[in-house]
């Protein structure tokens, strides 16, 4: 069981927090705050700028091309062909990017395309599988993977960046600290790289939808003094001066 923390915060105190973060802690949609938000993240497109520049200069691909799902896949197609042409061996092009979370792509992508895949209300879940929406999601995810424009081999896509398998990946904003500073091209050779963090690509012509994910803290039942002390700590921890320091060091959103 978790304590309802809502009575321990004034309306003024609640207004200082992002409304969506507090709403996520209202597990039963009844106004109770059972999970106190402390660590929230979204998704970004991370790019190995150092190795992207030669490709961009040769093909004319720009950061703007990477702002949409379709543009990113077209750039990935060009990157595959560009790397394939650098050797005599056929069909040995490289993948440009990968994704850490398929679920986020499906949920946010469907929402951008006008379909809410599922809703949950009063303990009942409603599923919606709109065929045109799912077809577009398929064409812009699985098809590029099959063609070799996108890839996933390590546990996380930042692992693939480190060994040079990818130049970019879509992942959590909290993964910024894991982006490698060098690429290992062999057991004995490596070179330094610089990172760029770009907005997560959205479907062309659609209102962008960004995932909000993360963790919170709960307070278990205890004495009134114990509960009040826990709430005092959570308020202190999420004060701007403390929260900003935590956000900078962890990659989570303020």
Name the predicted role of every residue range.
Residues 1-44, 53, 109-110, 190-201:
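Hinge/lid segment of periplasmic solute-binding proteins
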Residues 6-17, 61-67, 90, 96, ...:
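Short, solvent-exposed loop/beta-turn-alpha elements that line the ligand-binding surface or hinge
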Residues 26-43, 70-126:
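Extracytoplasmic/periplasmic solute-binding protein
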Residues 31, 135, 139, 146-147, ...:
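Extracytoplasmic/periplasmic substrate-recognition and gating elements
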Residues 67-71, 150-163:
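Short helix-initiation/N-cap motifs at beta->coil->alpha
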Residues 73-80, 121-154, 200:
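Glycine-centered hinge/linker elements that transmit conformational signals in sensory
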Residues 167-172:
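Paired acidic/hydrophobic, glycine-rich loop segments that form the ligand-binding mouth/hinge
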Residues 173-190:
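A ligand-binding cleft/hinge motif common to bilobed small-molecule-binding domains
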């Amino acid at each position: 069981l978790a304590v309802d923390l809502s009575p321990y915060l004034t309306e003024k105190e609640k207004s200082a927090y992002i409304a969506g973060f507090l709403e996520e802690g209202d597990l039963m949609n009844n106004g109770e705050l059972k999970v106190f938000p402390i660590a929230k993240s979204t998704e970004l497109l991370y790019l190995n700028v150092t190795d992207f520049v030669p490709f961009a200069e040769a093909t004319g691909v720009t950061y703007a091309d990477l702002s949409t799902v379709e543009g990113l896949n077209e750039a990935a197609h060009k990157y595959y062909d560009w790397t394939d042409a650098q050797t005599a061996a056929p069909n040995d092009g490289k993948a440009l990017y990968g994704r850490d979370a398929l679920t986020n792509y499906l949920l946010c992508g469907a929402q951008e395309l006008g379909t809410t895949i599922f809703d949950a209300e009063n303990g009942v879940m409603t599923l919606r599988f709109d065929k045109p929406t799912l077809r577009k999601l398929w064409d812009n995810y699985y098809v590029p993977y099959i063609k070799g424009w996108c890839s996933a081999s390590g546990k996380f896509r930042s692992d693939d960046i480190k060994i040079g398998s990818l130049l970019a990946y879509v992942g959590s904003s909290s993964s910024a600290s894991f982006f490698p500073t060098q690429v290992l091209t062999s057991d004995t050779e490596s070179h330094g790289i610089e990172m760029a963090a770009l907005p997560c690509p959205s479907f062309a012509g659609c209102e962008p939808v960004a995932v909000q994910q993360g963790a919170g803290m709960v307070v278990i039942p205890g004495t009134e003094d114990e509960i009040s002390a826990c709430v005092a700590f959570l308020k202190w921890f999420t004060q701007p001066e403390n929260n900003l320091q935590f956000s900078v060091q962890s990659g989570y959103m303020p």
